[in-house]
């Protein structure tokens, strides 16, 4: 195991919370990178309680709505500031047609979207983003480079209907990136 990619939904409650907490603790003990994808329902259902369980994750990934729901913020910058105050220093915020924002201790950078034609359905685009972002970081790319690759993956995933309409592969990313 090289890393843990976790849906924060697993931390909302029920038996999955204890399993997910065990996975996070094992990852911390082994010093494995952890990427937690927030998910809208998780932030709304668990609120600030969720932050307690996410302490120590390497990267927290979310979209703008999820950021605002989790933090109670009215803007992206306010939400990022609140998460930084809570100790989260590595964030990736998906902002739809505007691309994404990568936040590190060194600062924040807006990553331009990857232009694709025929956007059909954004279902699954966030999952593709998270997978590509985690892969890129694990391969040694910078957070900005990871954000670019993740934007591409999310855009390609949105060119088909449904979460599994377009399963983006590494080969797809290589071809599309040129």
Provide a role label for each language-model segment.
Residues 25-29, 74-178:
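Conserved phosphate-binding/catalytic region of the ribokinase-like
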Residues 1-109, 172:
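Ribokinase/PfkB-type carbohydrate-kinase core domain
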């Amino acid at each position: 195991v090289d890393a843990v990619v976790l849906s924060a939904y697993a931390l909302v409650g029920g038996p999955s919370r204890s399993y997910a907490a065990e996975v996070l603790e094992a990852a911390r003990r082994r010093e494995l990178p952890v990427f937690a994808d927030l998910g809208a329902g998780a932030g709304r259902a668990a609120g600030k309680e969720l932050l307690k369980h996410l302490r120590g994750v390497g990267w927290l990934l979310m979209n703008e709505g999820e950021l605002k729901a989790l933090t109670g913020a009215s803007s992206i910058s306010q939400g990022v500031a609140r998460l930084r105050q809570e100790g989260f220093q590595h964030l990736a915020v998906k902002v739809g047609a505007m691309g994404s924002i990568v936040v590190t201790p060194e600062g924040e950078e807006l990553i331009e979207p990857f232009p694709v034609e025929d956007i059909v359905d954004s279902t699954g685009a966030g999952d593709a983003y998270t997978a590509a972002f985690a892969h890129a970081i694990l391969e040694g790319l910078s957070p900005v480079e990871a954000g670019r690759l993740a934007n591409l993956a999310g855009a390609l995933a949105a060119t088909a209907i449904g979460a599994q309409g377009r399963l983006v592969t590494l080969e797809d990313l290589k071809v599309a990136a040129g």
